[in-house]
Amino acid sequence: MSIWSAGGSAGAQLLRAQWPSLLLWAYLLSPLFARLLSDCQCAKIDGLVLYTFLISVLWLLVLRCGWANQFKVHLWLLPFYLLASIDLFLVLNFGSRLTAAYLLIGLTNYKEATDFLATYWRSMAGIVVVFVGCYGVGLAGLYGRRLGRSKAMCQLALAGLVLGYGAYFVKTVSINALNKDAVLDLVAKDQSTPVGYLSQLALTVVLYEESKGYIRQRQQSQVQLTGVSDQAGIQTLVFVIGESSRPHNWSLYGYPNKTTPNLERQPGLFKFNRMCTTAPYTSVAVPSLLSLEPISDWNLIASNKSLVGILRAAGFDTYWLSSQEVDSFGGIIPQIAAEAQYRQYLERSYDGALLPVLQNVLSKANGRRQAIFLHIKGSHFEYARRFPSDFARFKPASGSQKDRITADYDNSVLYTDWILSSIMHQLTASQSKALLVYASDHGENLLDDDRKLLGHGMGNAYDLATTAFVWSTGNLSAAQMRKLQKLKTRQDQQVSIASLPHTLLNIAGITMPGYDSTQDLLSDDFKASLCPHLLGTGYVPTFDFSIKHIAAE
């Protein structure tokens, strides 16, 4: 009993002496604790998470044993605490750690980053409260204290770090080779706290510089066409890029609320019941949607001309009309828009403001072929700001947050339905041989299950499933109309938005390197997609879902 008593007394003394450091450590390690708890619910704990946790503990031991004035140490660590707060937010809401991919999205797509904050401000506020409490109490407890140092423990922890990093690097080199990629892989996998945040920041700088290089390559790249058929007969091609519009809330796909009454009445509309996106982020999905390159090779997507530039090279007058804000912080989408001959942005307007602009463009055709790209706000958060009051027809069934959000979202879909049907009327009235393609960049989470997820970026059946259809005026040639009938056979096949550029090359009669008949929805060679996509955690080769099941939920 005396041994247990002595041990308990020593433990109590240690706790009294070290509690401020332990509290601060606990907060820094909280993203890892949350990730470990998440993994414990699975059959197997991710070895990388366990490795990262051990490396983090070793770094914290070095910081504790190497300096006596822990108050100053943790004061200097304030930026890392802020990064840990963001990290914890991502783990709790998206199940992902803070990586260079997320940092790059924030750096190159300021609008998407600020929209994320607007969506999740409650969650962020809660984390800030916890941070202020832990950090404030911990610093107060350390103020005026000088704690003992342990040179031996510090050296032992450093030796453990050398061994841990070294073993992982040797493993990486054995799989690949001793080169730059091996070093970058070690940096990318270092998600320890606090030093791992420096690794992710350094990798972000590398990726940002690479992205600027891709943009320079893109500007210098040339479109290599091998042929443009005179028999295609398409005079006007309109491509509407939607925003955050998931099929679960479209009555066109079986949703009980009549959110798409106009589209349901349109003859000749070919919808896709199992359409998936290539990323649940606009900054990645839109470039992929307009590229011939696979999402597995982002470098090629970023450095080569898009469908906009291809159609321009094929002799189409190209237009980029957008109700989205101009993103002056970089990214690929502004570069895609720059490939068009004519550009117009209607910022802070409802999507309906694009209709008179489109009408004016159509009136200028004068027999020339036109390719018109419309980038709309669609159903982007905040949903209540996406439609005028005349379209506020759906009311919340109760005062719950989910019912309020769902009603606003449904009204935004209703407004998009009106926009798209209005475009169809304009194309029909123009008497041009026209084709309309619509695809949303990604879907959206609407507090659908116990996880209470809102927004996009998670990579699940709600934000990876997306809406898309093809429609044409009734005056196309008989050959073209027969060709479009093949789309009926694709209705229930799993299809990626990556197929649309290849399909449009076929319908426009354009041949060029990079065209892939296995991705062409009009080709007999077409193969159903495995729906590969990019997440903040990296490339994911497959995704499987059934929208018919989801729509019935």
Model-assigned labels for residue ranges:
Residues 224-227, 452-459:
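Short, P/G- and charge-enriched loop/turn segments at secondary-structure junctions
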Residues 320-322, 371-378, 410-413, 435-440, ...:
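Short beta-strand segments
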Residues 2-189:
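Transmembrane and membrane-interface helices of multi-pass
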Residues 59-60, 220-226, 396-436, 470:
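A long, amphipathic alpha-helix that forms part
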Residues 2-25, 37-44, 65-71, 139-143, ...:
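Membrane-interface soluble catalytic domains
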Residues 167-239, 244-397, 496-527:
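Active-site-proximal alpha/beta segments of enzymes that process anionic O-linked groups
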Residues 466-468:
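SF2 helicase/translocase ATPase core recognition
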Residues 238-239, 415-454, 501-505:
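Metal-dependent active-site segment of extracytoplasmic phospho-/sulfohydrolases and closely related
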